[in-house]
Amino acid sequence: MIVVIDTNVWISALQFAKGRGTPTLALEKAMSQDVNATCDEIDAEIVRVLTEKFSWERHRATSALQMILARGIRVKIRGTVKVCRDPNDDMFLECAALAKADLLVAGDKDLLILGAYKGTRIITPSEYLRAG
């Protein structure tokens, strides 16, 4: 199964994971059972949030991301999707569409409200953990 994971879930898993919270378990499931799809723009946003908002050293943020995405696939988005009520979230939809992702795992209400986009279901980390 191909999955795209939004920044909200990444940050919750990497920054706030004290033990075995839902975002951490979702990220672990994606790493061990599924294939993560990403793009340069998603990676840059994750690194930016970790370094600017949470004072991670850039090397630490980049290393964590590279290790997690080692089993993933990369797509090149063009920024042409204009669907989400928050334009900053359109990159997740475009990445999912180009990767032909089965799921977009999101904690962002602007994405979740859509329910699906071009064959990709948009679900919460809890729903992802319950999915086979």
Regions from the PLM with identified roles:
Residues D6-T7, T38-C39, G107-D108, T124:
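A secondary-structure boundary/capping signal
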Residues S12-L14, V49, L114, A131-G132:
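Residues that scaffold the ATP/ADP-binding catalytic core of kinase and kinase-like folds
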Residues M1-T38:
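Short, well-structured N-terminal submotif of metal-dependent ribonuclease cores
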Residues K109-G132:
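Acidic, PIN/NYN-like endoribonuclease modules and their adjacent C-terminal/linker elements
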